[in-house]
Curated annotation (Swiss-Prot):
Residues 111-246, 342-469 form the MRH domain. This is Endoplasmic reticulum lectin 1. One of its GO terms (cellular component) is endoplasmic reticulum quality control compartment. May form a complex with OS9, HSPA5, SYVN1, and SEL1L with which it interacts directly. Interacts (via PRKCSH 2 domain) with KREMEN2 (when glycosylated). Interacts with HSPA5. Disulfide bonds join C113-C126, C199-C232, C215-C244, C344-C357, C421-C455, C436-C467. The gene is ERLEC1. Keywords: Disulfide bond, Endoplasmic reticulum, Glycoprotein, Repeat, Signal. It is found in: Endoplasmic reticulum lumen. Its main location: endoplasmic reticulum. InterPro entries: Man6P_isomerase_rcpt-bd_dom_sf (IPR009011), MRH_dom (IPR044865), OS-9-like (IPR045149), OS9-like_dom (IPR012913). Isoform 1 and isoform 2 are N-glycosylated. Probable lectin that binds selectively to improperly folded lumenal proteins. May function in endoplasmic reticulum quality control and endoplasmic reticulum-associated degradation (ERAD) of both non-glycosylated proteins and glycoproteins. Residues 1-33 form the signal peptide. Glycans are attached at N195.
Length: 483
């Protein structure tokens, strides 16, 4: 709990408020049915004293929607509760406007496309037509080479009609599908797309996608996210203002709703026990503030050993990005274990996860509680093959400092002889790029994987720890323990 605006604010929806009302107070309805509080809605308890006026804007209040609360010290309060749900339900019931498909029709008719640009891939959603993922490279002579995958095309009329009919039936039965968007369950309208580029990992079955349109009044049909939910099956979330006129698809913010507990004659404006609790809390805050900065780093490392954050989400070729916080090993020990291959980096978002063991292998895998672990060898280490590769490629890249000196910026290693690729009939192979990364956290590691060509991968590993060993790289980019 914390003080704010003349009242006590709940930091967790429902919980602290109910703790105050139930732990300190005893409720009485005076013969009426007690109003219900929902755990899904955040509340803030205010103690305005004996005289105050109810708000006339925002959430609706009625004088008869209250409970009488009595504390253990016989202090009495009349707590007026907000009416938070009835308005939305009535609006949904009375709605007679266009259905969601009709609301989106202008977007499908005007042949517009939305784009999302990421570090390597660009995603193109042409509404009602197709979803494309592509990367453009300029070759010698300014020739542009395009590497692309279609993640889905508009389904045939009969299949599309079936999906629309299912969506309309769900709407009539109030079963609007929802998706967790930034912690809030948000309604969406689904549009299916199939017949995409064949997927080698699924016996050349075509890629398919579900486009999820959600209401956002200030949006311009932006692509919020692209995610591969299972192998070669994708979810694309589009923000659009067109659905916002439909009450069932409208984005609903979760404002903090005020409860006003008015003291009755003979009672203080705020319960004695609550005031004592706040005084104790204020005393505890002072040493907490003093120790906060000292403990912050160690607390993060001990309590959050593996946090993954996506910065390039979307498809099979853009495989993964992850951030890992390493436990408190000394730098020397960590470097030694990393170079020996005994400390491996693992990460990934979506269906596939990835494992990189320096000087050993790069694996791609999926774990399922029913079918077990499916693993694909992306590449294995062979020093002689790498040295041959280094003769034709840049194994050691430099950065020119302001004083004219050069430092190693990145080293690249070749891992070949992976599992045979269904598309090329050749072994998979991967180039591992190790880079120095400045970070506030000395133990932060970023791992990402790309697939610029079929079954030819790039694995990036960036960390402040690598900064300490890059300058040990020889002409072939091979690393060793620093002196």
């Amino acid at each position: 709990m914390e003080e704010g605006g003349g009242g006590v604010r709940s930091l967790v929806p429902g919980g602290p408020v109910l703790l105050v009302l139930c732990g300190l107070l005893e409720a009485s309805g005076g013969g009426r049915a007690l109003p219900q509080l929902s755990d899904d809605i955040p509340f803030r308890v205010n103690w305005p004293g004996t005289e105050f006026s109810l708000p006339t804007t925002g959430v609706l209040y009625k004088e008869d929607n209250y409970v009488i609360m009595t504390t253990a010290h016989k202090e009495k309060y009349k707590c007026i509760l907000p009416l938070v749900t009835s308005g939305d339900e009535e609006e949904e019931k009375d709605y007679k406007g266009p259905n969601p498909r009709e609301l989106l029709e202008p977007l499908f008719k005007q042949s517009s496309c939305s784009y999302r640009i990421e570090s390597y891939w660009t995603y193109e959603v042409c509404h009602g037509k197709h979803i494309r993922q592509y990367h453009e490279e300029k070759e010698t002579g300014q020739k542009i080479n395009i590497h692309e995958y279609y993640l889905g095309n508009m389904l045939a009329k009969n299949l599309l009609f079936e999906k629309e009919r299912e969506a309309e039936e769900k709407e009539k039965s109030n079963e609007i599908p929802t998706k967790n968007i930034e912690g809030q369950m948000t309604p969406y309208y689904p549009v299916g797309m199939g017949n995409g580029t064949p997927c080698s990992l699924k016996q050349n079955r075509p890629r398919s996608s579900t486009v999820m349109y959600i209401c956002h009044p200030e949006s311009k049909h932006e692509i919020l996210s692209v995610a591969e939910v299972t192998t070669c099956e994708y979810e694309v979330v589009i923000l659009t203002p067109l659905l916002c006129s439909h009450p069932k698809y409208r984005f609903r913010a979760s404002p903090v709703n005020d409860i006003f507990c008015q003291s009755l004659p003979g009672s203080p404006f705020k319960p004695l026990t609550l005031r004592q609790l706040e005084q104790q809390e204020e005393i505890l805050r002072v040493p907490f503030r003093r120790n906060k900065e000292e403990d912050l780093q160690s607390t993060k490392e001990e309590r959050f050993p593996a946090i993954h954050k996506s910065i390039a989400i979307g498809s099979q070729p853009v495989l993964t990005v992850g951030t890992t916080h390493i436990s408190k090993l000394t730098d020397d020990q960590l470097i030694k274990e990393f170079l020996s291959g005994s400390y491996c980096f693992r990460g990934g978002v979506g269906w596939w996860k990835y494992e990189f063991c320096y000087g050993k292998h790069v694996h791609q895998y999926h774990e399922d509680k029913d079918s077990g672990k499916t693993s694909v060898v992306v590449g294995t280490w062979n020093q002689e093959e790498h040295i041959e590769w280094a003769k034709k490629n840049t194994a050691r890249a430099y950065h020119l400092q302001d004083d004219g000196t050069q430092t190693v910026r990145m080293v690249s290693h070749f891992y070949g002889n992976g599992d045979i690729c269904d598309i090329t009939d050749k072994p998979r192979q991967v180039t591992v790029k190790l880079k120095c990364k400045e970070s506030d956290s000395p133990h932060a590691v970023t791992v990402y994987m790309l697939e610029p060509h079929s079954c030819q991968y790039i694995l990036g590993v960036e960390s402040p720890v690598i900064c300490k060993i890059l300058d040990t790289a020889d002409e072939n980019g091979l690393l060793s323990l620093p002196n």
